[in-house]
Each structure stands twice: as structure tokens, then as C-alpha cells.
Amino acid sequence: MDIKLKDFEGPLDLLLHLVSKYQMDIYDVPITEVIEQYLAYVSTLQAMRLEVTGEYMVMASQLMLIKSRKLLPKVAEVTDLGDDLEQDLLSQIEEYRKFKLLGEHLEAKHQERAQYYSKAPTELIYEDAELVHDKTTIDLFLTFSNILAKKKEEFAQNHTTILRDEYKIEDMMIIVKESLIGRDQLRLQDLFKEAQNVQEVITLFLATLELIKTQELILVQEESFGDIYLMEKKEESQVPQS
């Protein structure tokens, strides 16, 4: 079995990688083969005495349950339960794929707009940038995906079209920083309340990513799936001593 070691952002990222190799619709892939490859990958990490985080092991146990259900005799109730578990897994992978495509789209937009800068294009996020504590960027994109979907629905209901010159990231960076004046923090969703169209929403988000990249802003999320807040990055000399 050809399993190459590489870094993944989480178990769904690994599963998406394995599913993508089949070059077919996610719901048509041979799920048993994918499960075997995933378990082989985790087993390889353990055999090499590399740390396997809890989320990978939780997913492994879920996959083993799905696999065991598929091996049981074809009893109606068992088959239905197994099919439900399998469909739920595939739905999770499909949703993750959408979030990843969104991230790639946003990065492409950033690179396109970076051509208007006097400086050379840089990566959206680099290793030293402080995002959500112990989180991956998927948390940020997941939140933004929900915001964008809600704003699209809002714009559609209002049936309004506002014409304006092309939004610029550098202008939006100023707006983001001004939104934090007089505040300790700003809920990410609140940043987009006054946005007039989808293009403005996306440019605001790109501006936020740029400020995070330059470490002018940091993101804070107090609990899993909780709200994400923007905060100004304070100089060490400004941080009160405990």
C-alpha cells in the first residue's frame, strides 16, 4: 500500500487526500479502501513512534466501526446504520473539501491583488502568525464561510446592487484597524455588519488575513466552535505584568 508520510491539518485533511486520489465523486469512492489506507497511515506513525494526536485516533475508531458494520451479515437494521455512518463521514469530507477550496480561492485572490502592491506578494499566513490558539486555519475559514453564506442571503433578500470602485485590501486594512479603536476586541462576525456586497465581505476578510500575517492583529477563540475575536497585537512592553 503506497502511503507517503506528510503533514496534514487534521484527520479530515488526511481523508480528503486519500479520497482525492480516486479522482471521482466523493460519494462514489470505495470507502473500505479509504478506511484501510487511513488506518495504515495511523499505524505507520505509531510504528515509527511518532505522536498521533487524539483527533486522529477518534476518527480511526469511527472508521473501524464503519468497516466492521460493512463486514456484518446483510441485516436490514445493521445495513441502514452502517450506511448512515458512511454517508455522514462522506458528508464531512465533502464539507471540508468546500472549506479547503474556499481557502485556495481566497489565497488566489490575495495573490491577484498583491500585484497592485509595491512590495512583492507574500503568503497569506506564515508560521509565526498568531491565529487561534492551538487551532488550524480551518477554524477561521469555517467561521468566514458561515458569515459569507449569511451575507449572501441578506443581500439576496434586500435585492440591492451597490456600484462602487474595486475594493482595495490596503483600504480595508485601515477600516479593520479603525473598527478596533476604543475596543479591546471585536467579534469577527461584527466586522462584516456594514458590508454592502459580497466583494466587500471578501476584501474585508483578505485585509484581516493580511493584518494577522503582519502580526498587527491576533485572533482569540476561548472555546471550540466559539466566537472568534479580533484583537490588536500589543507590544511586550504594553502587556501588564501579572
Swiss-Prot record:
Organism lineage string: Bacteria, Bacillati, Bacillota, Bacilli, Lactobacillales
Primary residence: cytoplasm
Oligomer status and interactors: Component of a cohesin-like complex composed of ScpA, ScpB and the Smc homodimer, in which ScpA and ScpB bind to the head domain of Smc. The presence of the three proteins is required for the association of the complex with DNA.
UniProt record, GO biological process: cell division; chromosome segregation; DNA replication
Function: Participates in chromosomal partition during cell division. May act via the formation of a condensin-like complex containing Smc and ScpB that pull DNA away from mid-cell into both cell halves.
Annotated InterPro entries: ScpA, ScpA-like_C
Cellular component terms (Gene Ontology): cytoplasm
Subcellular location: Cytoplasm
Gene name per UniProt: scpA
Key words of the record: Cell cycle, Cell division, Chromosome partition, Cytoplasm
Naturally occurring in which organism (per UniProt): Streptococcus pneumoniae serotype 4 (strain ATCC BAA-334 / TIGR4)
Family the UniProt entry places it in: Belongs to the ScpA family.
Pfam families reported for this sequence: SMC_ScpA
Protein name (record): Segregation and condensation protein A
Highest taxon of the lineage: Bacteria
